[in-house]
Amino acid sequence: MFGAKKGNGHNKDFYDFNPKNLETIRNDLKNRHAELVIDALLKEEARQEIKRIIKRDYPVHFMDIDEDKVDDVIEYVVSELVGTGVIERLIKDRPDITDISYNGSHLIVESSDYKEIYKDNEHQITEQYITRLIQKFAHAVGKEFTPKNPIFDGVYGSIRINAVHSQNTNGNSTMSLRIVRPNLVLNEKNFETFAPQFIYDFFKVVMESRNNILISGETGTGKTEVLKLLFSFVRFDHKAIMIEDVPETHVKSLFPDKDVFSWLTGNGVTVTDEIVAALRNNPRWIMISELRGKETYEMIQAVLSGHHVVTSLHSVDAETSPKRLVNMSKIGYQVDEKSLEEDIMRYFNFGFHIKRVVVKTTDTTGKPIKRVVRYLAKIVEYSVEGCQMVFEQKYRNGKFTFSTGTLSEEFHDKLAEIDLSYELPKYTDEVAFKKGLIISR
């Protein structure tokens, strides 16, 4: 009988489920239900069948568990045996998590607000545990993770994973997971943590008037989230094509009422191929989640043919993004650098640069914590004469301040053509109060 002990004070934590019993069940399931175990990582019905088998065939291992905890313990056992263990529990219990990594010694958990070492039950996080976890991910997508195949890149559900085998590290295997959920992380309600409200209004008119935009920043600054927010302002009558190598934006589920094609690269199809294909589908917008190489040249040609583009790239600042486009174009094409850069400066309208900073603050109880803040550092307007600052935000000496510049007559004329107007307010070193964020030094 399951859960013979109830309400007697014996509240055994299911994370302490006997490892030997776990291993016994694991080996037995592999021998008796090998195909079902494989299916259970991807198929919910197979996972439920595994739960039924465990409950039916292994009651002796659950005799000392409180009756009201048995289902939770079985769920834990299943997550360890056929799921992704601590990873799926973290994702389920902490919906704000964006990144989980293992550096060979510690499991690091990160969200938009914090970065910390995962300490609970850390005795479980061993090299063997992590390697087994990576191999589950690899198997799920039809790849191997072995000394002969030491680098693994893959996508499993909402998780993007990269792992390097201990064969090629100084120590244990390493792993990085990016968790992408189908929601609008940056939105109107929390926008003021990112930039002032008048910039949110600016984003709307920029998209309504169909401007070409480059979003730059380091890894982890939130470029994709800005791209998704901008996408939210695309009108139904402006067909959009989203091109990405991994399913990060989830634009089809986020914006079911928009006319959007959502394409993925892979199986021999490149970003370049999909840009060329996009031109045959009569879109107003071509959105490319990230530029990395020679596909940049075809993207520029799409702009020159009258299509509108929003894309992201790695660049040190918004001012150098046009030069980065030139250099990436050169990877696959012979180009006249000066002429190409002039085209970029003339036909791309704005550059947005994003930064992130870790600040000292307090939680709701007053406890000192460190918080990751992603913020809009700069907006520039491009022209053949150069870059004009539109907005700039800085973090200095424990304070966020922002200033505004000017918008060109050409931009105002563009708005007037579609009966829109926008006045950029004037600010110089204005202190930016971030909602819910009290910074201490």
From Swiss-Prot:
Name the domain of life this protein comes from.
Answer: Bacteria
SUPFAM superfamilies in alphabetical order: P-loop containing nucleoside triphosphate hydrolases
Q: Name one Pfam family in it.
A: T2SSE
The GO molecular function terms of this record are: ATP binding; ATP hydrolysis activity
Annotated coiled-coil positions are none
Which UniProt keyword terms apply here? ATP-binding, Nucleotide-binding, Plasmid
CDD domains in the record: VirB11-like_ATPase
Q: Identify the InterPro entries for this entry.
A: P-loop_NTPase (IPR027417), Sigma_54_int_dom_ATP-bd_1 (IPR025662), T2SS/T4SS_dom (IPR001482), T4SS_GSP_E_ATPase (IPR050921)
* Residues given in the record as ATP binding sites: G217, E218, T219, G220, T221, G222, K223, T224
UniProt lists the family membership as follows: Belongs to the GSP E family.
What is the official name of this protein in its record? Uncharacterized protein pXO2-25/BXB0023/GBAA_pXO2_0023
